[in-house]
């Protein structure tokens, strides 16, 4: 499973972007599960498609409470154009990331229960602080949902979940 994940990620710069997202999301001390940002995944993809046209391919979409990062596959999935969606607005794209590789998906592949996905993680891993939800490209245009959370012990976990939030795998980062 870890091999597929590594293949589905853009190796250059994504780690930095995700680290910034995780750091930005760590400030919450709320006992309730913040799920409002899950809907930003669809809103961000819709905004990209309104800007570029329907049928775009994506490497990854990662939502956090403050913003959503979208990595649009271009040039035959050999490069990615990073966008940020924040406060209901798609910001201008960053420069292309060349040398990208991995699986891609289209908007139609995203099928997630916005209300349940993070709630189930919180129920199954009590005490973990949810930081981000990512939709990653999988084999054959499928998607994989990964929740990043800080464990009670302070470590960061990548939690692979089903569209309904059922925990499928937990990996320390």
Q: Where are the regions that the model predicts?
A:
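Long, charged/polar, surface-exposed segments that mediate recognition or autoinhibition
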Residues: 87-132
């Amino acid at each position: 499973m870890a091999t597929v994940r590594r293949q589905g990620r853009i190796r250059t710069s994504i780690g930095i972007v995700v680290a910034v997202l995780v750091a930005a999301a760590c400030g919450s001390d709320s006992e309730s599960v913040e799920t409002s940002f899950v809907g930003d995944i669809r809103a961000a993809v819709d905004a990209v498609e309104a800007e570029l046209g329907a049928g775009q391919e994506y490497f990854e979409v990662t939502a956090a409470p403050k913003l959503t990062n979208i990595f649009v596959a271009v040039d035959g999935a050999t490069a990615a154009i990073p966008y940020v969606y924040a406060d209901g607005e798609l910001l201008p794209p960053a420069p292309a990331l060349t040398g990208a590789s991995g699986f891609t998906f289209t908007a139609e592949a995203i099928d997630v229960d916005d209300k349940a996905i993070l709630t189930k993680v919180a129920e199954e891993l009590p005490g973990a602080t949810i930081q981000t939800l990512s939709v990653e490209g999988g084999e054959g245009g499928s998607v994989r949902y990964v929740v990043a959370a800080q464990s009670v012990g302070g470590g960061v976990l990548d939690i692979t979940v089903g569209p309904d939030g059922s925990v499928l795998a937990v990996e320390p980062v």
